[in-house]
A protein has these predicted regions:
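Long amphipathic alpha-helical segments used for membrane anchoring, targeting, substrate engagement
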Residues: 1-31, 81-103
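Conserved acidic
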Residues: 6, 63-70
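Residue-level signature of catalytic and energy-coupling elements of molecular machines
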Residues: 14, 47, 71
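Short, well-ordered turn and helix-capping elements at secondary-structure junctions
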Residues: 25, 29, 34-36, 56-58
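N-terminal intrinsically disordered, cationic/polar leader segments
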Residues: 33-53
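Short beta-strands and strand-coil junctions in structured, solvent-facing domains, enriched
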Residues: 38-40, 59-61, 79
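A short interface-forming secondary-structure element
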Residues: 52-64
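Stable alpha-helical structural segments in soluble proteins, enriched in small hydrophobic residues
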Residues: 70, 74-82
Length: 103
């Protein structure tokens, strides 16, 4: 019976830790950029796009494809930084694990 109670306590603690981490990720802001800062995106800890900043000199109707590539590169840069931040928050524990709702 004691083992069951210990397991329940451990599961409750893990759930509380997950809830706390979810809240931290929601307010986390990570910036990624490309083109030497010509395009910058900001993601939250859940990799949801929060903002995009495009320098006016990049906007050229004849170079739309380049702008699209810069946006994708900036997003990918920020997404990689979110992964790094998450791994750091987890302290290496389970950084390689695919935890639903966290990765």
């Amino acid at each position: 019976m004691k083992n069951v109670m210990d397991l329940q306590k451990m599961l409750k603690s893990a759930k509380e830790m997950q809830d706390r981490l979810q809240k931290e990720l929601a307010v986390l802001r990570i910036e990624g950029s490309s083109g030497g800062g010509m395009v910058t995106v900001v993601l939250d800890g859940h990799k949801a796009l929060q903002s995009i900043r495009i320098e006016p000199e990049v906007v050229n109707k004849d170079e739309v494809e380049m702008l699209q590539d810069l946006i994708v590169a900036a997003f990918n840069d920020a997404a990689a930084k979110v992964e790094e931040a998450l791994a750091e928050k987890l302290g290496g524990l389970g950084a390689g694990l695919k935890i639903p709702g966290l990765t």
